[in-house]
Regions:
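Gly/Pro-rich cap/lid or specificity-loop segments adjacent to the active site
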Residues: 2-145
Length: 145
């Protein structure tokens, strides 16, 4: 896991976290992919003690929103949580899948096999990997659209 230094935008503190995860959890030492999560906190000095709330973008194919201000549901969530904006595998700053990257995987059969690793079951496994690094042994909550 690699984490950025905290940085601020008006009313918010952000920390970017990068992780490596197996492309195929049945072969954990094989090919790895990148996962990206942005931690969003309010400016309360005790915010680092709050539990995590993971935001799951409704997708498919969309990155997590980039917070630019503390309004709406995010404002409410930050009263109780640190929010993780999770770019699921295949999207955003995580290893992405698009027509260009898919073309690098070979023929149609190889491309289809590659895409089998970008389903919800692996997105959940990735989330658990992230949880094990950011808050080992602690539960977290989820929200999505």
């Amino acid at each position: 896991m690699n984490s950025s230094d905290p940085y601020r935008i008006p009313g918010l503190e952000l920390i970017d976290h990068a992780f490596e995860a197996p492309l195929d959890y049945l072969d954990p030492r094989g090919r790895q992919i990148d996962l990206f999560v942005r931690e969003v906190r309010d400016l309360d000095p005790k915010s680092s003690e709050k539990p995590f709330l993971v935001f799951l973008q409704g997708g498919p194919g969309f990155r997590a929103p980039i917070p630019i201000q503390k309004t709406g549901w995010l404002k409410r969530a930050l009263t109780e949580y640190r929010v993780l904006m999770y770019d699921t595998r295949g999207n955003g700053l995580s290893t992405s899948v698009d027509h260009q990257t898919l073309g690098l995987e070979g023929d149609a059969a190889a491309q289809a096999e590659y895409l089998t690793h970008f389903r919800q079951d692996n997105i959940v496994r990735d989330a658990e990997l992230i949880r094990s690094k950011l808050s080992p042994g602690m539960p977290w909550s989820t929200i999505g659209q």
